[in-house]
Curated annotation (Swiss-Prot):
<dbReference type="GO" id="GO:0000049">
    <property type="term" value="F:tRNA binding"/>
</dbReference>
<keyword id="KW-0067">ATP-binding</keyword>
<dbReference type="InterPro" id="IPR000924">
    <property type="entry name" value="Glu/Gln-tRNA-synth"/>
</dbReference>
<feature type="binding site">
    <location>
        <position position="258"/>
    </location>
    <ligand>
        <name>ATP</name>
    </ligand>
</feature>
<comment type="similarity">
    <text>Belongs to the class-I aminoacyl-tRNA synthetase family. Glutamate--tRNA ligase type 1 subfamily.</text>
</comment>
<dbReference type="InterPro" id="IPR045462">
    <property type="entry name" value="aa-tRNA-synth_I_cd-bd"/>
</dbReference>
<keyword id="KW-0648">Protein biosynthesis</keyword>
<keyword id="KW-0547">Nucleotide-binding</keyword>
<dbReference type="GO" id="GO:0004818">
    <property type="term" value="F:glutamate-tRNA ligase activity"/>
</dbReference>
<dbReference type="Pfam" id="PF19269">
    <property type="entry name" value="Anticodon_2"/>
</dbReference>
<dbReference type="InterPro" id="IPR014729">
    <property type="entry name" value="Rossmann-like_a/b/a_fold"/>
</dbReference>
<comment type="subunit">
    <text>Monomer.</text>
</comment>
<dbReference type="GO" id="GO:0005524">
    <property type="term" value="F:ATP binding"/>
</dbReference>
<dbReference type="InterPro" id="IPR033910">
    <property type="entry name" value="GluRS_core"/>
</dbReference>
<keyword id="KW-0436">Ligase</keyword>
<dbReference type="InterPro" id="IPR001412">
    <property type="entry name" value="aa-tRNA-synth_I_CS"/>
</dbReference>
<protein>
    <recommendedName>
        <fullName>Glutamate--tRNA ligase</fullName>
        <ecNumber>6.1.1.17</ecNumber>
    </recommendedName>
</protein>
Length: 486
């Protein structure tokens, strides 16, 4: 590429890092790293009403957890928060006012609301009507004096070129254009409190920080013509724009909503549940982009190498919680035991299960886990007297030969000495029950598994029985025999 790549992720510190914002950050990160460019973070905190205490720290902490790093940010550079750049915004506000490209607007919220209501009743498209329309210079001066005498604080509006055409070649969606007359009239670039509006400040920031490419969600498409107006008014070259498609819920087919309880939507949720960051990073990278081929598991380094902005999807990206869980399970299975055990320790400790067998339990159930917090429900059988059964499990235990199998296997366990009770000796005892009773296959193994573990599926049965212990295994079988004899 001919020009230096400089991209940014510019969150508002209004709460936790959402999966959609994480995707925006991640695609900018991959784009910069792939092209040897600069990835920076800027905090857009001009909306003081939505500001959340500690929101900035939370955003950066969760980005780091995902595995991203950056070259410039408020941590290392001055004036990378919009609230620290008010003088710069004012400089360009004053310039536009002096050049007649912007003006002070004294219309009140009540007047704006009344005009919107009139337009709605008349079936007109809502838009701001210039309050100075038809006024002479003397009338305009008198109007301003009257408003200021009444204590009305003005906003500043950009004078829109109604006949202008604002177009760009979008990196994702191709050619897009808007007519200046369809923007809604002259729009506010500075609020009454002196803070700039988003669409003004973002242009000043992107130009000042020499941003070359703006990659963001397609909910920002409608903002782009307004931003192009500011670039035009100030005589600046605009960056390239790319608008990623929406993320939809794979089950409903609708835009992902915070009300969708079947999905975890905040990065903090994944951290707390014990997902591996590499898995979440991998999953998010494939939301609206793919490198081609059948593979879906990629390291961060592989994703950086493979990233190609030309493969960003034009179709909505489906957020599939089941796919993420499958991917997470793959990462956990292939992670080293020490890593997963360290992640499991807080969960085990809180549940009072950080015993001398804890690491063995993690090793036993690691292949089943989608998130590390699942170590608690998976190991319930080791810390309870009688496991809760599902309807399917209860149905298995109504089989005619179940009592025979359980009585025979209980007798085998009771006959074993402590020295004999080791993993490799347990399977032969099950086979001995088969030989004695003539019962085999599922009719043999399933009742033993359910009686001991309360599960129809799980780790190797001898491993489970050994970790559970001889006495507790016998106790579980006795409890099950009592239950099925009722």
């Amino acid at each position: 590429m001919s020009k230096d790549i400089r991209v940014r992720y510019a969150p508002s510190p209004t709460g936790l890092l959402h999966i959609g914002n994480a995707r925006t950050a991640l695609f900018n990160y991959l784009y910069a790293r792939h092209h040897g460019g600069t990835f920076l973070i800027r905090i857009e905190d001009t909306d003081r009403k939505r500001h959340v205490e500690d929101g900035e720290r939370s955003q950066l902490e969760n980005l780091r957890w995902l595995g991203m790093d950056w070259d410039e940010s408020p941590e290392s550079h001055e004036n990378y928060r919009q609230s620290e750049r008010l003088d710069l915004y004012q400089k360009y506000i004053d310039q536009l006012l002096a050049e007649g490209k912007a003006y002070k607007s004294y219309v009140t919220e009540e007047e704006l609301a009344a005009e919107r209501e009139r337009q709605e009743v008349a079936g007109e498209t809502p838009r701001y009507i210039n309050e100075y329309l038809g006024m002479s210079e003397e009338e305009k001066a008198a109007y301003i004096a009257e408003r200021e005498a009444a204590g009305i604080i003005p906003t500043v509006r950009l004078a829109v070129n109604e006949s202008g055409i604002y177009k760009w070649h979008d990196m994702v969606k191709g050619d897009i254009e808007f007519e200046g007359g369809n923007i809604g009239g002259d729009w506010v670039i500075q609020k009454k409190d002196g803070y700039p509006t988003y669409n003004f400040a973002v242009v000043i920031d992107d130009h000042d920080m020499q941003i070359s490419h703006v990659i963001r969600g397609d909910d920002h498409i409608a903002n782009t013509p307004k931003q192009l107006m500011v670039y035009e008014a100030l005589g600046w070259e605009a960056p390239e724009f790319g608008h990623m498609t929406l993320i939809i819920n794979s089950e409903t087919g609708k835009k992902l909503s915070k009300r969708d309880t079947n999905t975890l939507q905040f990065i903090e949720d994944y951290r707390k549940k014990g997902y591996l960051p590499e898995a979440v990073f991998n999953f998010i990278a494939l939301l609206g982009w793919n490198p081609g081929g059948e593979d879906e598991i990629f390291s961060r380094e592989e994703l950086i190498k493979l990233f190609d902005e030309n493969r960003l999807s034009k179709s909505p990206a489906a957020f599939d919680q089941k796919k993420l869980d499958w991917m997470s399970n793959d990462y956990i299975k292939n992670a080293d035991l020490e890593t997963i055990f360290e992640m499991a320790k807080p969960f085990l400790e809180e549940a009072g299960r950080l015993t001398d067998k804890a690491e063995k339990l993690v090793e036993l159930y690691k292949p089943q886990m989608k998130s590390v917090d699942e170590i608690i429900p998976l190991t319930d059988l080791f810390f309870s007297d009688f496991p809760e059964l599902t309807e399917a499990e209860r149905e298995v235990m109504t089989g005619e030969t179940v009592p025979t199998v359980l009585e025979a296997f209980k007798a085998k366990l009771e006959a074993m000495t402590d020295d004999e009770f080791v993993t490799e000796n347990i399977f032969p005892q099950i086979k001995a029950v088969q030989k004695e009773t003539g019962i085999k296959g599922k009719n043999l193994f399933m009742p033993i598994r359910i009686a001991v573990s309360g599960e129809m599926h799980g780790p190797e049965l001898p491993d489970t029985i050994f970790l559970l212990g001889r006495e507790k295994s016998i106790q579980h079988i006795e409890n099950m025999l009592k239950e099925i004899s009722k």
